Amino acid sequence: MSTNRPAHAKKAEIVAEIVSKIQSAQGVAIAEYKHLTVEQMSNLRRQALKQGIEVKIYKDSLVRRAVEELNLTELNEYLTQQNVFVFSNDDAIGAAKLVANFAKENEALKLKAGVYEGAAMDTAAIMEVATLPSKEDLYSMFASSLLYPLRQVMAVINAVADTKQD
């Protein structure tokens, strides 16, 4: 009987870790990796590491306990088969975007669900999130839109200067 307690304590510790990761992550993606090779999984982990994204594999039963604690039970229906959990702490769409892009090249990986801004999302919704531009892209678009009027003014000034020189 005493040998069961350490195993139970270890599982409770893992559940607490999962709860903490989901709470602290801006975005979480859940994907099935059933037929992914070791090389493909290593490649996914390398790509994630470059982007500051964490890739973890947990037993679905432990994730079920964690999502129940977080009132995200809508995710339970996606916790079947072999799942990989991808956590993005810096960019809310980073995890979904990474998995969606990787799945385009590796059909063995299937984006199933996720958590975005603290809400559970089904497959269609998380795929929609994955198509959104990243934070860096949005900053670039914003800066470009701010600079556009300035460029127009500079073009007019240059045109006037050119006509005066002629």
From Swiss-Prot:
Recorded hits in InterPro entries, A to Z, give: Ribosomal_uL10 (IPR001790), Ribosomal_uL10-like_sf (IPR043141), Ribosomal_uL10_bac (IPR022973), Ribosomal_uL10_bac_type (IPR047865)
Organism this protein belongs to = Mesoplasma florum (strain ATCC 33453 / NBRC 100688 / NCTC 11704 / L1) (Acholeplasma florum)
What terms describe the molecular function in GO for this protein?
A: large ribosomal subunit rRNA binding
Write the record's keywords in alphabetical order, separated by commas. Answer: Ribonucleoprotein, Ribosomal protein, RNA-binding, rRNA-binding
Q: Name one GO cellular component term.
A: ribosome
Pfam families linked: Ribosomal_L10
Question: Which BP terms in the Gene Ontology apply to this protein?
Answer: translation
Give the source lineage, highest ranks first: Bacteria, Bacillati, Mycoplasmatota, Mollicutes, Entomoplasmatales
Q: Which PANTHER family does the record associate with it?
A: 39S RIBOSOMAL PROTEIN L10, MITOCHONDRIAL
What does UniProt give as the signal peptide span?
none
The domain of life for this entry's organism is Bacteria
Q: What is this protein called?
A: Large ribosomal subunit protein uL10
